[in-house]
Amino acid sequence: ASKAVKNNEINFYPNHWVKTYNHWMDNIQDWCISRQLYWGHQIPVWYKKGTDRANQDNWFVSTTPPTDLENWEQDNDVLDTWFSSWLWPFAVHGWPDVKTTKYFPTNALVTGPDIIFFWVARMIMSGYEFMGDLPFKDVYFTSILRDEKGRKLSKSLGNSPDPITLFEKYGTDATRFSIMLMSPQGSDVYFSEHGIEVGRNFMTKIWNASRFIMLNHEDSFADEIDIEALDNFDKWILDSIDETVNEVNKYFDKYQFNEAIKKIYDFTWNEFCNWYIEIVKHRFREGDITSKSNSFNISKKIIKKVLLLLHPIAPFVSEEIWNHLKDTNEEDIIISCWPKAKNSKISHDRDEILDFKEIVTSIRTIRSELNVPPSKKIDVIAHAKNESIESRLNPLIDLIKSLSNSKNLNLSSKKEKPENSAVAVCKSVELYIPLGDLVNKEE
């Protein structure tokens, strides 16, 4: 059992718990196996009636009782719970009557680091002793939840929230999502109910995004994505979801669940909802039928991939949305194939995407700093650094205006700086927003 971990036949995640395991294994001491409880496996020891129990000659130790049972009485104590728990990997599959099973050894054990020796080490020992093999290949140690004072959550301290109350207030999926998001591998978690709001808001975000897409479906839309009609933003988001799938799979393989969830969160919220969906809104208002159709099919494809990635963490929300999105003969999400990204990247103009984001963000920032109300449109003057940049950004003017709530956007490579303007310097352009009636000059 000791060699199995030292030789990496069994891997710990995170690996630093190997040191704790080795410390216990290298310093094993005698273990009192009897407990005075009402439940458990009664100790298989009988004492001859009317004799001195301290004398081993009066003991009968066996897995079967003595033949003259009327002359013996069994020990009242039961075996320590870990004595029976260490048999769990194979005892639940019919052992000792069943010697082989496809479920032994299993791939992974998920447990807490506080029972490394009590349970993990003893299961490894019993696996080799009774089955001649390791019981599992990987051991993932969960984080320990602590309160804001650093104390372990426990009933005795009364500092553990009622999970049912959290479920009713925030939702089951939101609670699970939030706790996993805040639990980095190998680190304890300082639990705060405020953190559960992140999961609730995320579930609401993906629900609203899915609802928006389905409400904008038209019968005239094509059934598939028109590859020839993809623009740079389409290629960017399709490449981004493939990259997300790759990263999430890598994190799952290394049991870095919080990193996987963070990647899902960042892509869905920041890339898909905050940018691509906003672009799609403009297309649904202004685009032609091909643009609208592609926007719908791409958005639907991406949401479904996100739901598949999300399903192990948020099974209820993901299944409900999936049932609204799936095609007539498509399988339920629980038996659908896990998403795999393509090995090749989808070629797109990354600089154009970055410039577009920076310009829109800069205009929004100025609006916020000047406290311009959302209902008021503004004028923007953009000086491109050169004519090449001007040519690249010209086709995006209407989209920039739409996402920045601007009335006019004058783009040129001229360097005349307008007076009395708010300024933002971007990588590709300098932005000027005439203050005019946007601010009170007397203040």
Regions found by a protein language model. Name each.
Residues 164-167, 227-237, 291, 348-349, ...:
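A ubiquitous short alpha-helical element
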Residues 1-219, 237-281, 285-286, 297-310:
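Structured secondary-structure scaffolds
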Residues 22, 124, 167, 265, ...:
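Generic hydrophobic alpha-helical scaffold/packing signal
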Residues 189-197, 221-232, 249-259, 343-346, ...:
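Short, charged, low-complexity loops and linkers
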Residues 43-51, 140-145, 183, 194-199, ...:
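A glycine-rich phosphate-binding loop feature that marks nucleotide/adenosyl-phosphate handling sites
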Residues 49-72, 95-101, 217-232, 285-293, ...:
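Short, glycine- and charge-enriched coil/turn segments that flank and shape catalytic ligand pockets
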Residues 325-443:
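C-terminal low-complexity, glycine/proline- and small-hydrophobic-enriched intrinsically disordered tails
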